[in-house]
Amino acid sequence: MVRSPSLRVDEPDQCDETEGDLEGKAEVGSGLLGASVGRVGGLELHQEHNRSEDGDIVPANLSPDYKAAEAAFRKSRDPSERMEWLREMLRTIPKHKGTEHLQADIKARIKGLAEQLESATKGAGHGGPALVIRPEGAAQIVLIGPPNAGKSSLHTRLTGSAAHVGLYPFTTQYPKAGMMPHEDVHFQLIDLPPIAQEHPVPWLVNTLQTADAALLVVDLGEPSCIEQLQAVRSMLGQQRVTLTERLEATADEDPFALRLPTLMLANKADGMADFDAELLALRELSGSRLPVFAVSAATGHGLGDIGPWLFQNLGIVRVYTKTPGHPADKHRPFTLRRGQTVGDVARLVHQDLARSLRYARVWGRSGFEGQQVGHDHCVADGDIVELHA
């Protein structure tokens, strides 16, 4: 098996610095706005200027209300909530020449997301396909790649779904969701249509917005593998989507650009005589720095390594809750990200509990047995938390 480099995660020293990094995806780009600094999620963005229609740089002077709405939009993973925050961004953005491009971009995003939400409603009522997949489980992972790379076969093998598999290209036409188990949690795996110049999918980029990471599937036995990989990166780049080996907080200029942490899966490894040589050639010719696993949907080779890799590199944290005088529920953990807190646990249980929470007791690696802690206490994987309102 090819040895895969780990996704590089820049570990901050403080709990509150990590939450913004890992709870929301790192989204960056060349974008519309300039002189922007701050954490992922827009929590500390200071956007200073924009370009007008004639190319002149003019002040944007974005208001605190707009920045708050943008921060909420970035953090949200629910499509309906993202629509609400987009509308709030449009309502609160200063209306002048310096924000013309950003206003147009927000309106386009609202239109595209509205069409997706409408398709989901019609699909639910009439049996049609939904283009919006609401995130579930520990993380939402999208399967992307060129035609006939074996995405649907991998999806079927990893989730037990009934994804349609064909020998001809473009078999997958709509998103297909399934749950991939890992220990006592599940990752939501979304099989998407292939990415190719001859078959563009207009709604694909909007579907990627709620994903936490991507699995890029390639077939090293395909002679045009390099060209296919370059085409995938180019098409996504045109839509301000970058596949990256890093999961990090980055100064963000464009609220709609997306950096998607990605693991490459070199499929059909069982058919390669010298996989190491093929993989080396792929890296050298494509310039890709993505971590790679050699896998086979046919034999199952390497598939058992995907769940542990996602769990570790996405910073998944399992927390088990208990009520006073009763044992912890060890069957259905709440899943958070490394650096999140007791307050985040309370919000997952119920929004009202988050507001009324006075303190919590914690058992596990983040404190001594039964330690009384406050809202800002960082939880660790395997912690048991008893919430007191």
Language-model features, listed with the residues they occupy:
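Intrinsically disordered, low-complexity, charge-rich segments with an acidic bias
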Residues: 11-24, 46-54
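Polybasic, low-complexity intrinsically disordered segments
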Residues: 33-50
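C-terminal-of-GTPase-core extension/linker across diverse P-loop GTPases
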Residues: 55-56, 70, 74-144, 149, ...
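Switch II of P-loop NTPase G domains
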Residues: 125-131, 136-138, 171-175, 187-215, ...
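A conserved segment at the C-terminal end of the G1
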Residues: 152-163
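Short beta-strand-centered segment that lines the nucleotide-binding/catalytic pocket of NTP-utilizing
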Residues: 163-178
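Short glycine-/polar-rich loops that comprise or flank the Walker A/P-loop
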Residues: 175, 185, 210-214, 258-262, ...
